[in-house]
A protein has these predicted regions:
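Active-site lining segments that contact anionic ligands and/or coordinate catalytic metals
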Residues: 103, 134, 151
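Acidic beta-strand-to-loop metal/phosphate-binding motif
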Residues: 134-144
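Gly/Ser/Thr/Ala-enriched C-terminal appendages of enzymes
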Residues: 142-161
Length: 161
Protein backbone atom coordinates (compact mmCIF):
# COMPACT_ATOMS: atom_id res chain seq x y z
CA UNK A 1 0.00 0.00 0.00
CA UNK A 2 2.77 2.44 0.98
CA UNK A 3 4.56 1.84 -2.31
CA UNK A 4 1.37 2.59 -4.30
CA UNK A 5 0.85 5.87 -2.45
CA UNK A 6 4.46 6.94 -2.99
CA UNK A 7 4.37 5.98 -6.69
CA UNK A 8 1.16 7.95 -7.25
CA UNK A 9 2.53 10.93 -5.33
CA UNK A 10 5.69 11.00 -7.42
CA UNK A 11 3.58 10.88 -10.58
CA UNK A 12 0.92 13.47 -9.70
CA UNK A 13 2.34 15.85 -7.06
CA UNK A 14 4.71 18.45 -8.55
CA UNK A 15 6.35 19.25 -5.20
CA UNK A 16 7.50 15.63 -4.85
CA UNK A 17 10.67 14.72 -6.69
CA UNK A 18 12.46 11.48 -7.51
CA UNK A 19 15.30 12.24 -5.06
CA UNK A 20 12.96 12.25 -2.03
CA UNK A 21 13.01 9.10 0.07
CA UNK A 22 9.78 7.33 1.03
CA UNK A 23 9.53 9.00 4.46
CA UNK A 24 9.94 12.47 2.94
CA UNK A 25 7.27 11.75 0.30
CA UNK A 26 4.84 10.60 3.01
CA UNK A 27 5.57 13.72 5.09
CA UNK A 28 4.82 15.90 2.06
CA UNK A 29 1.43 14.18 1.92
CA UNK A 30 0.88 14.93 5.64
CA UNK A 31 1.38 11.27 6.58
CA UNK A 32 3.73 11.31 9.55
CA UNK A 33 5.31 8.24 11.07
CA UNK A 34 6.75 10.18 13.97
CA UNK A 35 6.24 13.64 15.35
CA UNK A 36 7.97 16.39 13.39
CA UNK A 37 10.42 18.67 15.16
CA UNK A 38 11.63 22.10 14.10
CA UNK A 39 14.92 23.25 15.61
CA UNK A 40 15.51 27.00 15.87
CA UNK A 41 18.14 29.19 17.48
CA UNK A 42 17.83 32.93 17.86
CA UNK A 43 15.54 35.89 18.54
CA UNK A 44 12.04 34.62 17.82
CA UNK A 45 9.00 35.60 19.85
CA UNK A 46 6.00 33.27 19.76
CA UNK A 47 2.53 33.15 21.17
CA UNK A 48 1.54 29.56 21.91
CA UNK A 49 -2.15 28.83 22.18
CA UNK A 50 -3.76 26.27 24.46
CA UNK A 51 -7.49 26.50 24.11
CA UNK A 52 -8.44 30.16 24.41
CA UNK A 53 -5.32 31.17 26.32
CA UNK A 54 -1.98 32.20 24.87
CA UNK A 55 1.45 32.26 26.46
CA UNK A 56 4.23 34.44 25.10
CA UNK A 57 7.58 32.72 24.68
CA UNK A 58 10.86 34.44 23.80
CA UNK A 59 13.17 31.87 22.21
CA UNK A 60 16.18 34.19 22.52
CA UNK A 61 16.39 32.93 26.11
CA UNK A 62 17.53 29.57 24.68
CA UNK A 63 20.99 30.51 23.42
CA UNK A 64 21.78 26.94 22.37
CA UNK A 65 18.55 26.60 20.45
CA UNK A 66 15.25 24.90 21.05
CA UNK A 67 13.28 22.13 19.35
CA UNK A 68 9.59 22.74 18.69
CA UNK A 69 7.49 19.58 18.39
CA UNK A 70 4.68 19.31 15.84
CA UNK A 71 1.98 20.30 18.35
CA UNK A 72 3.89 23.44 19.31
CA UNK A 73 4.50 24.32 15.65
CA UNK A 74 0.81 23.78 14.94
CA UNK A 75 -0.43 25.97 17.82
CA UNK A 76 2.23 28.70 17.76
CA UNK A 77 1.74 32.14 16.27
CA UNK A 78 4.71 34.31 15.40
CA UNK A 79 4.51 37.59 17.32
CA UNK A 80 4.10 40.63 15.07
CA UNK A 81 6.90 42.50 16.82
CA UNK A 82 10.30 40.89 16.28
CA UNK A 83 12.57 43.88 17.05
CA UNK A 84 15.87 41.99 17.35
CA UNK A 85 15.45 39.89 14.18
CA UNK A 86 17.68 41.12 11.33
CA UNK A 87 18.57 37.90 9.53
CA UNK A 88 17.13 34.40 9.00
CA UNK A 89 19.33 31.48 7.94
CA UNK A 90 17.78 28.13 7.01
CA UNK A 91 20.31 25.32 7.35
CA UNK A 92 20.08 21.88 5.74
CA UNK A 93 22.87 20.16 7.69
CA UNK A 94 22.47 19.50 11.43
CA UNK A 95 26.19 19.72 12.19
CA UNK A 96 26.31 23.15 10.57
CA UNK A 97 23.20 24.24 12.48
CA UNK A 98 24.68 23.12 15.80
CA UNK A 99 27.97 24.86 15.01
CA UNK A 100 26.29 28.24 14.51
CA UNK A 101 27.14 30.45 17.45
CA UNK A 102 24.22 32.33 18.96
CA UNK A 103 23.77 35.81 17.53
CA UNK A 104 21.07 38.06 19.02
CA UNK A 105 20.08 39.29 15.53
CA UNK A 106 20.07 35.99 13.59
CA UNK A 107 17.43 33.27 13.60
CA UNK A 108 18.86 29.91 12.53
CA UNK A 109 16.35 27.30 11.37
CA UNK A 110 17.41 23.68 10.86
CA UNK A 111 15.54 22.24 7.87
CA UNK A 112 16.59 18.56 8.31
CA UNK A 113 16.24 18.32 4.55
CA UNK A 114 12.79 19.19 3.23
CA UNK A 115 10.48 21.19 5.48
CA UNK A 116 7.25 19.31 6.19
CA UNK A 117 3.95 20.95 5.17
CA UNK A 118 3.30 21.89 8.82
CA UNK A 119 6.75 23.48 9.10
CA UNK A 120 6.22 25.34 5.81
CA UNK A 121 2.95 26.79 7.17
CA UNK A 122 4.77 27.94 10.31
CA UNK A 123 7.54 29.52 8.23
CA UNK A 124 4.93 31.27 6.06
CA UNK A 125 3.58 32.83 9.28
CA UNK A 126 7.11 34.07 9.97
CA UNK A 127 7.37 35.39 6.40
CA UNK A 128 4.15 37.39 6.81
CA UNK A 129 5.55 38.98 9.98
CA UNK A 130 8.87 40.01 8.38
CA UNK A 131 7.31 41.15 5.11
CA UNK A 132 8.25 44.76 4.43
CA UNK A 133 10.82 44.77 7.23
CA UNK A 134 14.58 44.93 6.90
CA UNK A 135 15.21 41.22 7.50
CA UNK A 136 17.61 39.33 5.22
CA UNK A 137 17.04 35.63 4.46
CA UNK A 138 19.80 33.16 3.61
CA UNK A 139 20.11 29.40 3.13
CA UNK A 140 23.02 27.08 3.88
CA UNK A 141 22.85 23.70 2.17
CA UNK A 142 24.54 21.06 0.10
CA UNK A 143 25.52 21.81 -3.49
CA UNK A 144 23.65 18.83 -4.92
CA UNK A 145 20.24 18.36 -6.52
CA UNK A 146 18.46 17.93 -3.18
CA UNK A 147 20.25 20.96 -1.72
CA UNK A 148 19.20 23.14 -4.66
CA UNK A 149 15.59 21.92 -4.32
CA UNK A 150 15.63 22.77 -0.61
CA UNK A 151 17.03 26.22 -1.45
CA UNK A 152 14.18 26.76 -3.91
CA UNK A 153 11.60 25.68 -1.34
CA UNK A 154 13.12 28.08 1.18
CA UNK A 155 13.03 30.85 -1.45
CA UNK A 156 9.37 30.15 -2.19
CA UNK A 157 8.50 30.41 1.52
CA UNK A 158 10.49 33.59 2.09
CA UNK A 159 9.63 35.22 -1.24
CA UNK A 160 10.19 39.00 -1.32
CA UNK A 161 7.92 39.70 -4.29
Amino acid sequence: MERNVVTAARRYCPEITADMDIQTVLEQLLIEENSQELAVKGPLKLKIWKGSEAKRVDLSDFTYGVVLNSQTVKHAMVEVEQPALKKIVTIENKTNYLAMEYDPEILYIYSHGYFSPLEREFLKKLQRVIEGKDVEVFHSGDMDYGGIRILNISRSIFSRE
